[in-house]
């Protein structure tokens, strides 16, 4: 997405890209709103290490060595009963000549909160909104609405904090090159939605093939991100129309005891409106984004 300073010439299909991005963001907002209506009763199931499970198997799987937003350590854990499914996916990919790479797993409430506030992330959201509006400073209401989708500002939207989601990439076993999905993890643009029409045909097919292998073992794709898959949470049960109460809600996890405790209130935003307003003012100043008419 272009920035105000040193902005490249608009692409011939710039308006179409903006239109799709807005459509996608509103679609995601509606999906997450519907997710809130899905009944959830935390079952208390503990977590298991994905890396330990892989080490005890014959599956070749990789793990990200980067940090979240620069300095937050990743936690490669997921609900215990989901481990066999991930191993099966990894084995299927190995048989195809691929390697599944886990980019992210469980996130604590603190991690999810900090992620949404870090300048590296928040500035990207602000810049994307500025681009969406054709070069106008975004309102706080738009930033709040987009943050709900892009960084799960409400706990009952965050499947990572439920211990039910993984972010993934895929690589070739023979030479270690990435299986292209249009852009590498992590991307925030009109290429991010799983069904983006602005991704080349080969990358679109790779997205489809990876999703088919993930969903064969129950890990459903999130339409808003080509790397995100989840199972057993409210979004999963809503999409599959299971008719069941979701057993996984956002939880605090004690790694020493492997005990989980449900959040007290999943409907309160991690970053409240007044603080988000302050962050927006800081970001606009930091980025130098002003109306074209000024």
PLM feature segments, named:
Residues 226:
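Catalytic and binding regions of secreted/periplasmic enzymes and modules that target cell-wall glycans
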Residues 1-105, 109-223, 236-294:
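Extracytoplasmic cell-surface/polysaccharide-interacting catalytic and binding patches
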Residues 232:
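Active-site beta-loop-alpha junctions enriched in small/polar residues
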């Amino acid at each position: 997405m272009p920035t105000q300073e040193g902005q490249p010439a608009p692409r011939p299909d710039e308006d179409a890209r903006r239109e799709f991005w807005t459509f996608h963001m509103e679609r995601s907002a509606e999906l997450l709103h519907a997710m809130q209506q899905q009944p959830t009763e935390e079952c208390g199931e503990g977590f298991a290490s994905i890396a330990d499970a892989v080490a005890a198997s014959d599956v070749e799987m990789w793990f990200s060595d980067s940090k979240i937003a620069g300095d937050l350590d990743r936690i490669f854990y997921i609900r215990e009963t989901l481990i066999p499914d991930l191993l099966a996916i990894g084995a299927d990919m190995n048989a195809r000549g691929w390697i599944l790479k886990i980019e992210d797993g469980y996130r604590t409430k603190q991690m999810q909160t900090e992620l949404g506030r870090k300048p590296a992330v928040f500035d990207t959201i602000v810049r994307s909104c500025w681009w969406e509006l054709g070069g106008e400073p975004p309102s706080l209401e738009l930033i709040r609405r987009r943050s709900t989708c892009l960084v799960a500002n409400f706990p009952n939207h965050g499947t990572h904090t439920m211990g039910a989601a993984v972010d993934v990439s895929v690589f070739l076993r023979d030479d270690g090159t990435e299986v292209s999905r249009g852009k590498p993890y992590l991307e925030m643009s009109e290429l991010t939605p799983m069904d983006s029409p602005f991704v080349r045909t080969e990358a679109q097919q790779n997205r489809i093939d990876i999703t088919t292998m993930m969903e064969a073992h129950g890990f459903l794709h999130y339409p808003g991100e080509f790397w995100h898959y989840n199972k057993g949470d409210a979004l999963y049960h809503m999409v599959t129309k299971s008719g069941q109460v979701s057993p996984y809600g956002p939880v605090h996890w004690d790694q020493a005891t492997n005990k989980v405790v449900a959040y007290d209130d999943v409907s309160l935003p991690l970053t409240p409106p007044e603080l988000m307003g302050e962050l927006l003012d800081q970001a606009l100043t930091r980025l130098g984004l002003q109306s074209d008419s000024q």
